[in-house]
C-alpha cells in the first residue's frame, strides 16, 4: 500500500517551469530520498506535498485521499503531515518540553507522559526537558524538532535537509538514528538532500531530480550500479566511463576485455565502472605491468592515479585507496571486479 502518490505534478513561477510531470509513489513505512543539485526543484516538490505550495496540475493522494489537483486543495494543517526543516525551527521562547508538547491535547499529566515518551523515542535525556533551544547541540535540536513532528502522529514525515548544518560525524550518527526511529514508528518519510551519500544511506527508495524532472527512481544500489545515464551516474558518485565495443556479454575497452551487464547488446557503446570495482596492485619489478603511473594526487585515504595503459597507450584517471608504493613511474596491474554497466543509446 502506498502512503503517498504523486501523479503528473507540475509547477511554474511566471514563465519558468520548475517541476515537469512528477510521478512518484512512497510505500507505507518506507524511506524515500529526493536528491538533486540546487535549483533542481526538490524543495518546491516537498513544499507542494506539505501543502505550502499549490501545483499547476496533477494529483496528490495521501493514503488514498485526494490532497489536491490544482483546482481544489487541502491546506497544510489538515493533511496530517510532519515537517522537519533544515534548522529545526524550534520556538526559542519554549523549553524542550514546551516545543515537543506544542499542540498536544489532553490534561497536564497526560501531556507530560506523552512528552516523556517522545523524548525517550528520539533518545533525548529527560533532564533536557527544562532547557532552552539555545542550550542544546545541533543534534539535540534536530531530535527535539523530530519529536515535535512525531507528537502529532503524522501519516507522512517530510525532512528538508535536516542534517546539513551538523558536523560530519554527528550528521552520520543523527541520520542513522532518525532512519531507525522512523522505521520503528512505521512512519513513511521523504528526505530532501543535495548529498548523494546521505540519500543512498538513508533511503529504501532514491529519486534523482534534475531540471525539474525525476531522472531515475529506484532502490539505492540499483541507481548506483545501474544509473540511467551519464549525468545520473556522475551525480551519484565517482565513475570511470569508457568507450567500448560490445559482443556476447563482453566489452573490449582501454582496460582490456571486461564483462558487462547486458549480453544482448553489441557494437559501440559507453560503459561505466565505479572506482571500487577496480583493484590496483603493484607489479613485480621484473615484469611489465598493465599500466604505469604517470601522476598521482594524494588526498589521504584516497589517491587519484593518472595511468598510461601499456597495451594501448590510453590515458586513464582512476581513484584508489592510498598505499605505499603508488608513485609516478610505478608499474601496476588492474583487476576489474563484477560487471561494467552499459549506458542506453
From Swiss-Prot:
Domain ABC transporter: 4-236
Family annotation (CDD domains): ABC_Carb_Solutes_like
Enzyme Commission designation: 7.2.2.7
GO molecular function, one term: ATP hydrolysis activity
Gene Ontology cellular-component annotations: ATP-binding cassette (ABC) transporter complex
Top-tier EC class: translocase
Entry's localization field: Cell inner membrane
Catalytic activity, as annotated: Fe(3+)(out) + ATP + H2O = Fe(3+)(in) + ADP + phosphate + H(+)
Lipid bilayer topology: Peripheral membrane protein
Cleavable signal peptide: none
UniProt-annotated binding residues for ATP: 36-43
Keywords: ATP-binding, Cell inner membrane, Cell membrane, Ion transport, Iron, Iron transport, Membrane, Nucleotide-binding, Translocase, Transport
Biological role stated in the UniProt entry: Part of the ABC transporter complex FbpABC involved in Fe(3+) ions import. Responsible for energy coupling to the transport system.
Subunit comment: The complex is composed of two ATP-binding proteins (FbpC), two transmembrane proteins (FbpB) and a solute-binding protein (FbpA).
Sequence similarity: Belongs to the ABC transporter superfamily. Fe(3+) ion importer (TC 3.A.1.10) family.
Name listed for the protein in its UniProt record: Fe(3+) ions import ATP-binding protein FbpC
Native source organism of the sequence: Serratia marcescens
Gene expressing this chain: fbpC
Amino acid at each position: 500500500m502506498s502512503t503517498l502518490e504523486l501523479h503528473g505534478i507540475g509547477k511554474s513561477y511566471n514563465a519558468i517551469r520548475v517541476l515537469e510531470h512528477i510521478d512518484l509513489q512512497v510505500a507505507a513505512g518506507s524511506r524515500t530520498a529526493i536528491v538533486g543539485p540546487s535549483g533542481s526543484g526538490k524543495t518546491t516538490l516537498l513544499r507542494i506535498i506539505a501543502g505550502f505550495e499549490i501545483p499547476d496540475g496533477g494529483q496528490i493522494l495521501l493514503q488514498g485521499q485526494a490532497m489536491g489537483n490544482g483546482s481544489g486543495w487541502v491546506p497544510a494543517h489538515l493533511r496530517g503531515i510532519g515537517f522537519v526543516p533544515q534548522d529545526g525551527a524550534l520556538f526559542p521562547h519554549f523549553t524542550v518540553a514546551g516545543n515537543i508538547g506544542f499542540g498536544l491535547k489532553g490534561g497536564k499529566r497526560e501531556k507530560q507522559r506523552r512528552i516523556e515518551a517522545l523524548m525517550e523515542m528520539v533518545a533525548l535525556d529527560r533532564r533536557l526537558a527544562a532547557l532552552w533551544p539555545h542550550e542544546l547541540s545541533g543534534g539535540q535540536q534536530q531530535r527535539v524538532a523530530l519529536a515535535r513532528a512525531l507528537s502529532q502522529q503524522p501519516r507522512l514525515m517530510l525532512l528538508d535537509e535536516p542534517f546539513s548544518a551538523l558536523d560530519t560525524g554527528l550528521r552520520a550518527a543523527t541520520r542513522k538514528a532518525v532512519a531507525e526511529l522512523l522505521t520503528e514508528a512505521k512512519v513513511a518519510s521523504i528526505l530532501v538532500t543535495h548529498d548523494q551519500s546521505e540519500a543512498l544511506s538513508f533511503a529504501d527508495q532514491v529519486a534523482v531530480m534534475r531540471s525539474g524532472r525525476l531522472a531515475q527512481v529506484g532502490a539505492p544500489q540499483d541507481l548506483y550500479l545501474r544509473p540511467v545515464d551519464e549525468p545520473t551516474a556522475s551525480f551519484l558518485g565517482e565513475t570511470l566511463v569508457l568507450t567500448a565495443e560490445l559482443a556476447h556479454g563482453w566489452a573490449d575497452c582501454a582496460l582490456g576485455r571486461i564483462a558487462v551487464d547486458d549480453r544482448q547488446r553489441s557494437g559501440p557503446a559507453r560503459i561505466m565502472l565505479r572506482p571500487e570495482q577496480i583493484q590496483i596492485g603493484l607489479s613485480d619489478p621484473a615484469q611489465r605491468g598493465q599500466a604505469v603511473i604517470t601522476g598521482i594526487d594524494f588526498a589521504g585515504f584516497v589517491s587519484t592515479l593518472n595511468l598510461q595503459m601499456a597495451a594501448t597507450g590510453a590515458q586513464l584517471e582512476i581513484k584508489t585507496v592510498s598505499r605505499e608504493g603508488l608513485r609516478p613511474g610505478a608499474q601496476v596491474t588492474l583487476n576489474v571486479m563484477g560487471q561494467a554497466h552499459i549506458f542506453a543509446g
